[in-house]
Amino acid sequence: MANKEKLPWDLEEEILSRVPPTSLDRFKTVCKRWNALFNDKTFINNHKMTFQFVLSTRSKIYSVSVNPKVEVRELTLNNPGLKAQRHKNLFATSGLLLCDVGNGAVVWNPWLKQSRCIKLEVNEPSLDFLGIGYDNNKRVEEIVYKTLSVYMKDLGSQYTWKIHDFASDTWIDQEIEKTKYSRRITEGSVTIRLTNLSVVSLNGKFFKFCDLPSGKNRRRDALALRVFREDRFSLLRQCHVTKKIKIWVTKNKIDNRYGGDVKWMSFMEVSIPTMPDLEHPKFNSQPSYFIDDKRLVICSCDETGRAWIYVVGGNKLVSKTQLDSVVDPWPLHCTYFPSLVLVPGGQREEAELQVQFQFPYLCFSYMEAKNLHVTTELYVPGKTKSSIKLHYG
């Protein structure tokens, strides 16, 4: 018996949380409520196919989720640029991954299976991609993404910023003052010095952003800067001698003002003498991490290069899991939060027009979002199927 009625919202949300991410973006136009739901970070984080880390080896790329069980999945590499050679660097910004592949880079949204290759104007063996960002110009509605890289024009000469504009597909060079760049300590598009944080704007200028709360650090101390709750910074420091971990977060959200009004506050301290070193300078391996409420989740490599996931909470090591399926040692890794951000000018795999999901008592099938109705079939074993047509406008 067909009835024109709506399912309970919590059930509807549960069904949508099982829809493949490649179709979620298309479904934004179904109704305002769905559009608002898909823009909600809580929905994205609770999606059945979400993950928190990305690891790259010589030949494969993996996603790792911790919910709370650690699950490792191999991500498909449908872009020739991702398959061609070992990645030099791996960065994540706003749901996009930047993979430095030596002779260029690939910008990738693994959740949406979209990618785009960035080709160099000329071969620059010394060029390193450092990150991806966008102009913080509120007067422009469309976000213009840019990548930041650095290279040495000639042996012994000073470094030069190289900035790629996605919209125009053009490159801009900007020379760097010799005293303002150190290749060893650059992390993404920010540079962590011993006592302060410097940033590079996308016009190639270099600014001191703020002082760091960690004070003076030893050479083998782990020091990692990450985004906290989307609009703030967090800083992790592990003392090489005592293994003590301390985390600070910025009190207020970060804006585009370069100044000294950034205030840090102590967020977490963990003292576990048996905690392994999170940094291995020989291989330039820094930890990746995220903070979930009062739980600290870290991805790091041990002294043999094997990848591990450590979950810390309540001043104790809750669990540690070796990622056995990641075979190659010393993988690149980064924290990654999925999003529905489209890769500018990117190519997407063709999604199937109809997908079906199995629940214990529910079979949900849908067509592309261009059809403004969804048919849901409810099935209870031993009884006849019934259909409910849901109409949205």
Swiss-Prot record:
Protein name: Putative F-box/kelch-repeat protein At1g32430
Disulphide connectivity of cysteines: none
Protein keywords: Kelch repeat, Repeat
Repeat in keyword set: yes
Ranges for domain F-box: 1-47
Pfam family, one: FBA_1
Naturally occurring in which organism (per UniProt): Arabidopsis thaliana
Kelch repeat residues: 151-199, 308-357
Entries under PROSITE patterns matching the protein: FBOX
